Every structure is written in structure tokens, then in C-alpha cells.
Amino acid sequence: KNPEADYESSIYRLADGRCAIPATAFKAALVGAVRHFDGLTMVQAKAALFVSPEEGTDLVPIVGTPHMREDMVRLESGVADIRYRAGFWPWSATLKVTFLPHMLDVSSVFALVDAAGLGGVGEWRPSAPKSASGSYGMFRVVG
């Protein structure tokens, strides 16, 4: 194992070196949060919402300094292993969300983004399908 290489390879970067998260991770969080609201299905939300990435990429820049995390994971075989990944705390991102106004209004989108933040983005987030015990990647609407 090469912890430093594993850590570096876990970071999404824009061409200018800034750290980022795939826009699709934020969209998936938004779509997943729809289950907590009435009146819109996940299929409808998938078609009604779009998270704009940085131009020319599929990434949303984040503000924060990465640090190396050492996480214990369980492989499919049941064997424990160590993963070295980047963690960011504190961190922030500016999301540009486009939506269909005949399906959602601005206040609904803000509420949806806030709810999506409880499920988080990235590894070991609360809404991760295989490990719902994480607390990383959570966010909230500010400002």
C-alpha cells in the first residue's frame, strides 16, 4: 500500500488544482432527499433538477483544505482493510441548481438542498447504501 498515493488519488481536482466533487454526487443527494417530501417522485426530480458543474468539467469546486483520513473498511470477502482518503473539514461549495419552475419553486429547492445535506456526498456519508453510519459529506444551506 502507498497511503500518500491512495490519498491523492481520492481527490477530484480541477485543471487549476482546486479540489472538487462531481456534480452528479450533489444531484444524487437532491434526488434521494425527495423521498422526504410529498408531491414529487424521485423519477420526476431526476428530470426536474440539474446541478451545474464548473464550465468544461463535471465537477463542482469545493473550498477546504484536504487532510488524510485513515478509514477501516470491510471488503466484500469480510476481511478488514485500511483506506487512505481525503477528508475536508470545514468545507463549502456553491451549488448552481437549475430546476423546472412548473414542478418546483425556489423555496422548495432550498428545502430540498438542505434535506440533501443530511444525507451528504462522498465516502462514508449518512445516506451511503452500504454504510449508513457515516457522518462525512454533510452540508446545509447558508446565507
What are these regions (language model features)?
Residues 1-143:
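RNA-interacting cores
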